[in-house]
Amino acid sequence: MPCVMNIWTGDGFKDVPADRMGPRLRYKDSIEQILSEPYDKNLVKPCVESKVFGIGVESYTVGSAEFTLSFAAMHDGCMPLMDNGHYHPQEYVSDKIPAMLCFYPEFALHLSLI
């Protein structure tokens, strides 16, 4: 039975960074280095998890939804992970699932029960 290897980064910066691309490029390179290591693709399913941009919490988020969805789309064998606790209160993961299925044959879910 395969296992999911979830890759994620911290929530973001509380200060206002001058360089918003550098951390993303380093994160992208780091994930690519991790995925370049040999592993059994039948037993390990790598995924990338986005972090929410919280109002008043971060100035910007390195591993945003745009970043992780784009990364997964460009890297065969890597799937996105949707965490139902990482969206704004007005967003519903259940509404996002059909949209994701249009582009990804599979993705991972992280469900938090409230």
Language-model features, listed with the residues they occupy:
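Active-site acidic/histidine proton-transfer and metal-coordination neighborhood
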Residues: 1-79
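Amphipathic alpha-helical packing elements
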Residues: 68-69, 77-97
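Acidic-and-aromatic substrate-binding clefts and catalytic sites of carbohydrate-active enzymes
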Residues: 54-61, 84-93, 114
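A short alpha/beta connector and helix-capping loop motif
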Residues: 89-114
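Structured core elements
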Residues: 47, 81, 108-110
